[in-house]
Curated annotation (Swiss-Prot):
Pfam families found in the cross-reference section: Pro_dh
Species annotation: Bacillus subtilis (strain 168)
Induction: The expression of the putBCP operon is induced in a PutR-dependent fashion by very low concentrations of L-proline in the growth medium. CodY represses the operon by displacing PutR from DNA.
Domain of life (superkingdom): Bacteria
GO molecular function, one term: proline dehydrogenase activity
Protein name: Proline dehydrogenase 2
Origin organism lineage: Bacteria, Bacillati, Bacillota, Bacilli, Bacillales
Segments traversing the membrane: none
Effect of a null allele: Deletion of the putBCP operon abolishes L-proline utilization.
Function text: Converts proline to delta-1-pyrroline-5-carboxylate. Important for the use of proline as a sole carbon and energy source or a sole nitrogen source.
Length: 303
């Protein structure tokens, strides 16, 4: 049986990542990523929008280790936001704090995020601060808290597999946060994360319930039918309008389900990554649900 740990191991292989960069983008583009850069992803965004699907784009690549590259990523993100507005695309932007220099200098991150959010506020484009591994969780939340007090168009992500997440929701409540709720895709110690899938699922339900009943806009990012049905039933029982939450799924996975949710009247947003560093992202996604492997590779290779 192919396990979650196997895919997480593969995601960290430098050799396989290099191979994927050399030849894989041709296979991945249009299947699991939008393209090698943002401009090449615009036709895909337009196609998704025409089907009633919203989008959030993410320039793949993290763990930047130079201030110069972090500033380049910042300028690229600013240009992406401006292009989204200019092209009238229905899209948010997602980004990781390590791509802006989190592992280099906190002042650099704040400098870069300030520039990005000033542009986002001007164009009314939501910027989602992606969550990474647990060791960076607190710093990421501190950054979100500081900027949420100043800017409207900023959101972040919480992971159900971490023990701390329910308390994090309570701590963020006063900020009226827009949160994307996910199960979690990084390999973590049992000291900080639930080791059993059943416990992760129960905690996921718990945080979905808490965030929605707190009255805050919520993105439920899942491909799990049980979680989708749970959210629908919760909304029905408590009279939560469809415009108070959205579902999110990955580009290239469960496309028909995405369209079905739109037809049912739900908000549906597609997470559309782009860039050459797609391999680690893809392996972590398979680690979330190893049962997706046949479906995923079929989607990558079919015409």
């Amino acid at each position: 049986m192919i396990t979650r740990d196997f895919f997480l191991f593969l995601s960290k292989s430098g050799f396989l990542n290099k191979m994927a960069r050399n030849w894989g983008s041709r296979v991945a583009a249009g299947k699991i990523i939008g393209g090698n850069d943002f401009n090449s992803s615009i036709p895909t965004i337009r196609q998704l929008n025409s089907q009633g699907l919203s989008v959030t784009v993410d320039h793949l690549g993290e763990f930047v280790n130079s201030a110069e590259v972090a500033r380049e990523r910042t300028e690229e993100c600013i240009q992406t936001i401006a292009t989204i507005a200019d092209q009238e695309l229905n899209s948010h932007v997602s980004l990781k704090m390590t791509s802006l220099g989190l592992d280099i200098d906190m002042d650099l991150v704040y400098e870069n995020m300030t520039k990005i959010l000033q542009t986002a506020e001007k164009h009314k484009i939501m910027v989602t601060i992606d969550m990474e591994d647990e060791v960076r969780c607190q710093k990421t939340l501190d950054i979100f808290k500081d900027f949420r007090k100043k800017y409207e168009h900023v959101s972040t992500v919480l992971q159900a597999y971490l023990y701390r997440t329910e308390k994090d929701i309570d701590d963020l409540d006063s900020l009226n946060p827009f949160l994307r709720l996910v199960k979690g895709a990084y390999k973590e110690s049992e000291k900080v994360a639930f080791p059993e899938k059943s416990d992760v699922d129960e905690n996921y339900k718990k945080i979905i319930r808490k965030q929605l009943l707190n009255g805050h806009y919520t993105a439920i990012a899942t491909h799990d039918d049980k979680m989708i049905d749970f959210t629908k039933q919760l909304a029905k029982e408590h009279g939560i309008a469809n415009d108070k939450f959205e579902f999110q799924m990955l580009y290239g996975m469960r496309s028909q389900t995405q369209l079905s949710l739109v037809k049912e009247g739900y908000n549906m947003r597609v997470y559309l990554p782009y860039g050459e560093d797609w391999y680690g992202y893809f392996m972590r996604r398979l680690a979330e649900r190893p049962s997706n492997i046949a479906f995923a590779f079929k989607g990558m290779t079919k015409k």
